[in-house]
């Protein structure tokens, strides 16, 4: 019996040391991310966020660190086509994933993405700090609307402002755009121009 208890204590101690090691020191993990069309391999601590992996390890500085708490949206990127807050996303959970930043939305020959062009045409930024996150969020939001995903303000009617169109797409009224972009803050207050830029692209 004492021998058995000794083994149990040893097992508990091993689990404890692993847990403490993870909490205080983390564990290194090798992963590959396809960032803006380019495969990038790196070794990171398991606690490293996708934002820190991109900025600090891969020198991809398009996504910005604003609040670092998932409240401002400046860090938004597209992860396998879906918009995510990279400051709340663990890099190790997405080994092999496709990551697209605002810088990667332009074509290989340098032609701007329609959203990038629209933000320029409508002065959808002032200081520009939130702009990469705004553009990535808008790109993800347009894809969600095209797939028919409703928002909190989507009308129950089959058509009309904010409602669904005949092909199942969500008609993006200004209210829809504001609701769907509400997770991205602009401290300069360029919201009117941001909505105008997205409205132009959504109408095409």
Name these PLM-found stretches.
Residues 10-13, 19:
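Ala/Thr-enriched low-complexity intrinsically disordered regions
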Residues 17, 21-204:
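Signature of N-terminal electron-transfer/Fe-S-associated modules in redox systems
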